[in-house]
Curated annotation (Swiss-Prot):
ATP binds at G86, G88, R89, K109, D121, G122, R172, R179, D258. This is Protein nucleotidyltransferase YdiU. Mg(2+) binds at N249, D258. The keyword tRNA processing does not apply. The gene is ydiU.
Length: 480
């Protein structure tokens, strides 16, 4: 089967990009590719043949129909207007045509200098490409909307960050790379007609059912807000901290995008800060819902030329509704509740307070809870708490709540184990794979990718364990 590409972005939004070619790396070589995703997309296996060099995965060749561009956008970073940003090291190679007219962006990260590189070198490093590949695939298999990773190319090109590292490229796929920052760019340039063109493009290609509806813009923004709310709810329930929620890192389609200083909670700490550059804690774990709302308000400002204020405010309310509704539903599932009862929030908050006091592992606590039997006061979870009396008191109330529903243990446990993962991408697991890869050993990278494809399967190895001492509180920065 021949891959087909189109260039809708390039053809329809000429003010939003610069056309240019990738700059290949020295001695580039393919070290990993996503075999399952490649099969789903009918990508010929021959394209991954190492004897052909890095090929399209390293920017050495293009596939027929590809028309590479670097996109321009702006944004607020850490709450401050940063002005023009853009693809400083990434290039949109093309949009693969899929069934029923949908498309998939092929975006090559680390592809070299662009007009938007500012003071950067246009490169990505092996460390960051491995982290993004692992994180995006982990999120996908957790059922959370995200970009995807298709391939990683390593090289001998030296790249200077805090220390000297080596350059790499990541092929990232997404239904769209349209960001809040695209709209901000033209709004602050006082070009509202181009802001509207972006909205028209989004509606035409991602929400075509609204194209001929008079209130299409208001409906579209409501859906953007709702998708954002559901996304943030998913992050909070799985213990994911993005780390750098700038407006240019926010997807119009409600995808998790731009994995940098992210982290999954180890110990339950609602104030967890994954990014060591975030000195004020703006992007701490428990502040993510408020930051997402703030970012939506910045996007709403750009839409004021063609959406009424009341409609924008209704959409922002929709964000809150979607966030709270989805979060509540997901947390009830994590607790094994099939109905909503008035004291559920209090019971959950009591558990969170107990976990915070004890430093309980977020993922392991909920996974162990999913093995609870209604009639048994014993639980392996009890042994993880120091204050056994406090746990026993909470656990008695929890089992009493379970007994209010006519659901047998087997069915409830099955539901809980579908939403409470045994494995998440802890920073120490990613670092172990990176350390080995930087020494030329890719086995752990491949092994970890396989493990992350089955996050809801119980394991008795260290992929499902708490981090070792060296792996606790690993510092992660925006440097990539």
């Amino acid at each position: 089967m021949t891959l087909s590409f189109t260039a809708r972005w390039r053809d329809e939004l000429p003010a939003t990009y610069t056309a240019l070619l990738p700059t290949p790396l020295k001695n580039a070589r393919l070290i990993w590719y996503n075999d399952k995703l490649a099969q789903q997309l009918a990508i010929p296996a021959s394209l991954f043949d190492a004897t052909n060099g890095a090929g399209v995965w390293g920017g050495e060749t293009l596939l027929p129909g590809m028309s590479p561009v670097a996109q321009v956008y702006s944004g607020h970073q850490f709450g401050v207007w940063a002005g023009q940003l853009g693809d400083g090291r990434g290039i949109l190679l093309g949009e693969q045509l899929l069934a029923y007219g949908s498309t998939l962006d092929w975006h090559l990260k680390g592809a070299g200098l662009t007009p938007y590189s500012r003071m950067g070198d246009g490169r990505a490093v092996l460390r960051s490409t491995i982290r993004e590949s692992l994180a995006s695939e982990a999120m996908h298999y957790l059922g959370i909307p995200t970009t995807r990773a298709l391939s990683i190319v390593a090289s001998d090109t030296p790249v200077q960050r805090e220390t000297q590292e080596t350059g790499a490229m990541l092929m990232r796929l997404a239904q769209s790379h349209m960001r809040f920052g695209h709209f901000e760019h033209f709004y602050y340039r006082r070009e509202p007609e181009k802001v509207q063109q972006l909205a028209d493009f989004a509606i035409r290609h991602y929400w075509p059912q609204w194209q001929d509806v008079p209130e299409k813009y208001a409906l579209w923004f409501e859906e953007v807000a709702a998708r954002t709310g559901r996304l943030i709810a998913e992050w909070q329930t799985v213990g994911f901290s993005h780390g750098v929620m700038n407006t240019d890192n926010m997807s119009i389609l409600g995808l998790t995008i731009d994995y940098g200083p992210f982290g999954f909670l180890d110990d339950y700490d609602p104030g967890f800060i994954g990014n060591h550059s975030d000195h004020q804690g703006r992007y701490r774990f428990d502040n993510q819902p408020l930051v997402a709302l703030w970012n939506l308000q910045r996007l709403a400002q750009t839409l004021t030329p063609f959406i009424e204020i009341d409609a924008l405010n209704r959409a922002l309310d929709r964000y809150q509704d979607a966030l709270l509704t989805h979060y509540g539903q997901r947390m009830r599932q994590k607790l094994g509740f099939f109905t909503e009862q008035k004291d559920d929030n209090a019971l959950l908050n009591e558990l969170f307070s107990l976990m915070a006091r004890e430093g309980s592992d977020y993922t392991r606590t909920f996974r162990m809870l999913s093995h609870t039997e209604q009639q048994s006061a014993s639980s392996p979870l009890r042994d993880t708490f120091i204050d056994r009396a406090a746990f026993d008191a909470w656990f008695d109330r929890y089992r009493a709540r379970l007994r209010t529903e006519a659901v047998d243990d087997a069915l409830r446990q099955q539901q809980m184990q579908r939403v409470n993962p045994a494995v998440v991408l802890r920073n120490w697991l990613a670092q172990r794979a990176i350390d080995a890869a930087e020494q030329g050993d890719m086995a752990e990278l491949h092994r970890l990718h396989e493990v992350l494809r089955q996050p809801f399967t119980d394991r008795d190895d260290d992929y499902a364990s708490r981090p070792p001492e060296w792996g606790k509180r690993l510092e992660v920065s925006c440097s990539s």
